[in-house]
């Protein structure tokens, strides 16, 4: 459903589409290879359905995107992975009501997000017994730096979908706009640790936040103040102290 330039489309349809459930972590390498082949075949069946059942017979796999024999991407898109025990654990309550929680995580944010909590459970056998977590809108939120730092491992920074978040809130923090910001913050944290000869958990969160602001990144979702505004960084810094308390919005609310 994702329309791209040059008359191309991204195939990513969760409802009776090309979602495929696999728990790769608990498989052997041989089992993983076989399971991923099944997943590829499932995607190709969906392409066939689009072409022959829905009548989109002019659509096919692009031959100028990936240098692979089957024209599919190098790796599958994983919606969820194993997660660390971080210095902090971000959950749904922190996003819904950031200023009433015991942990003042909004003071340490390094990325923002606003995608609904979205879990694709229908491909899981027995999904009927699971809670309905499909596309529930939530307020826009800030993600704290401590989710990237393992609690019991020195010298390691975690990014992508392995950060310290709850299963439910992973339905929004997993989105690429968020994980791209996580990668930026991880890079800033690593660079500052090396530059200042510090351990990862010794680096000042304010230094990381300043690096992100210098790169025109967001700490908190004050979207009514664009990055081009001369007061943008000031509002972000004041919000990170708790003096300014912004109300997160979502387009569906």
Model-derived regions, located:
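N-terminal propeptides
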Residues: 210-253
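Flavin (FAD/FMN)-binding glycine-rich loop and adjacent Rossmann-like elements that form
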Residues: 1-213
